[in-house]
Amino acid sequence: MRVKKDSSAAVLYCVDADNKDHAENIFHALRFAFLIAAQKQALFVLHSVSIFYQGKAWLFSGSSGTGKSTHANLWANRYHTPVLNGDLNVLGIKNGLPYLYGLPWCGTSETYTTTTYPLGGIVFLKQAPFNRVNSLPPDEQALFLMQRMISPTWTKDLLLKNLAFAETLAPLTKIFRLNCTKNPEAAAVMKAAIDQSI
């Protein structure tokens, strides 16, 4: 794949494109091109799992292996909240309000949506031997968002676009830090914090 330095175009070259074994690689290459195009439209991608609760999308984010899918499944099992996307979520702001936009990339979960939802909030997970919700100071909120975004950052301008979006999004939505176990109580603690905030 070749991408113009200013991200204005991407060209995918594939030898033997009809070979079924190449399908997954082509799919992921197209995802990369999509990330570039989305960013040009002020849409940014957060590595996270999303659920639908109280009429809004809620995201669980954290580094790989933190338990994003596990936590979303705790909610699904206990509160019957549908999982919207199991790996990547597109975020944007329209008329001053944050939204989640569906997309067909979902990691190994095979769970995704192509529907748009208002964004309720984002929960950054951290494994711990206890379950406790903390609020984050505004400067840390933008930093946490930046750390989990997978939108391109290979030039200073692209990095600054991501940072500007994170700084704009943070005050428009609820952002939590959940120190948690992988037990059902973790979902109960987080649900109580969300319910209290809405």
Identify what each model region corresponds to.
Residues 71:
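Hydrophobic positions on the alpha1 helix immediately C-terminal to the Walker A/P-loop
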Residues 68:
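Conserved lysine of the Walker
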Residues 1-64, 74-84, 89-198:
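A noncatalytic interaction/capping subdomain that flanks phosphate/NTP-handling catalytic cores
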